[in-house]
Amino acid sequence: EKGTIKTEHIVNAGGLWAREVGRMVGLELPLLAMEHHYLLTDEVPEIVEFNEKTGKELIHVIDFKGEIYTRQEQKGVLLGTYEQACEPWSPLETPWSFGHELLEPNLERISPSLEIGFKHFPPLEKAGIRRMINGPFTFAPDGNPLIGPVPGLTNYWSACAVMAGFSQGGGVGLALSNWMIEGDPGHDVFG
């Protein structure tokens, strides 16, 4: 307890602790912390060539069929997977003491997604893996962000389960700010 804060609106954007933040006001949010993998490749010559020719970085790409996403990371790529064989992490609560420590990676578990990624982005198949990361994210049951006003709690808003922060964060922030100020998110946030 650090004192009282008076405000017109409250936004639960608690990330891994969104469940705990919700419980502070009596909410049990439908969220689950799951393991989530991504990898960083070594330098990819085709990317270096593209950067030098255009003076630009590669765009962020989501391949829904392949259940992967990529973005340029230095002179290589960050390649993330939306795993079919998901593993829950701390299913009931996230300890307040958790400091974003990484979890043990499992290359075998994500190899089906990686194979699709390599097929859809052939230069990545030849790239070495510089680092493999596995860390927890919160997910809603439908895989979409849990966003909007919370029924029964005036001016209490949810911006939770934004698991792909660099691809969804800006849109979630814009929709929520429109909703809070204008009364409408400005587009369908439930699709």
Task: Briefly describe each language-model feature range.
Residues 57, 65, 74, 87-89, ...:
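C-terminal catalytic lobe of FAD-dependent flavoproteins
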